[in-house]
């Protein structure tokens, strides 16, 4: 091959490489490869407070709602966590309730919330429990944090469950089995 042919071939290969690279970058948000930027973003913005910490409710008498009962109450950080899920199932495989045959599946909770978010269900009137997440699965969680430890995106599943349980307990008076008796005996 002559020098001119090699230079032309190099140019064509270089242009083809550029076009393929740009097509890949454009396809990232619509494919599984989106985890390349969603997971690091979720890890960067993870909360620095201890896991399982129940936050004090300031001005409790003036609060309109407690916890999260509607999708519109989730903040940007919660929605980022839903979007960062790579659907690997590690959270479910280490969940002691799931392993014992209980109703809790952390992966399904996050995926159902992610699905609602992607469908545009950000309306404040949509009730999460029992429409999106079952009450039994929320109340079955032991808040051990094994799911968060195993999650490659560091999604704070326990915090999400705690927020929804707070709404069940403080707004609707629904507790896990045995808790109501304990509270009555105090």
Language-model segments: what does each one mean?
Residues 74, 82, 107-110, 114-186:
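Iron-sulfur-cluster electron-transfer modules
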Residues 45, 49, 90, 96, ...:
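Hydrophobic alpha-helix feature that most strongly marks membrane-spanning transmembrane helices
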Residues 51-104:
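Non-transmembrane accessory domains of multi-pass membrane transporters/channels
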Residues 36-37, 45, 93, 102-105, ...:
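Flexible loop/turn segments at secondary-structure boundaries
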Residues 19-20, 88-92, 141-145, 161:
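Short acidic (Asp/Glu) and glycine-rich catalytic loops that position anionic groups and cofactors
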Residues 10, 24-31, 79-82, 96-100, ...:
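Generic amphipathic alpha-helical segments used as scaffolds and interaction surfaces in large
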Residues 1-68:
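Membrane-embedded alpha-helical bundles of multi-pass integral membrane proteins
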């Amino acid at each position: 091959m002559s020098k001119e042919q090699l230079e032309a071939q190099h140019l064509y290969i270089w242009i083809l490489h550029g076009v393929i690279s740009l097509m890949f970058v454009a396809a990232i948000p619509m494919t599984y490869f989106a985890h390349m930027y969603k997971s690091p973003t979720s890890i960067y913005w993870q909360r620095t407070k201890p896991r399982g910490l129940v936050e004090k409710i300031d001005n409790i008498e003036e609060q309109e709602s407690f916890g999260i009962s509607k999708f519109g109450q989730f903040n940007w950080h919660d929605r980022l966590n839903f979007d960062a899920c790579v659907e690997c199932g590690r959270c479910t495989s280490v969940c002691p309730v799931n392993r014992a045959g209980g109703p809790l599946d952390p992966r399904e909770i996050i995926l159902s919330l992610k699905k609602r978010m992607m469908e545009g269900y950000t309306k404040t009137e949509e009730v999460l429990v029992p429409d999106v997440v079952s009450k039994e699965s929320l109340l079955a969680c032991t808040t051990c944090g094994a799911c968060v430890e195993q999650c490659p995106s560091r999604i704070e599943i326990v915090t999400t469950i705690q927020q929804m349980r707070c709404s069940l307990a403080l707004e609707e008076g629904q507790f896990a089995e045995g808790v109501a008796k304990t509270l009555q005996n105090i």
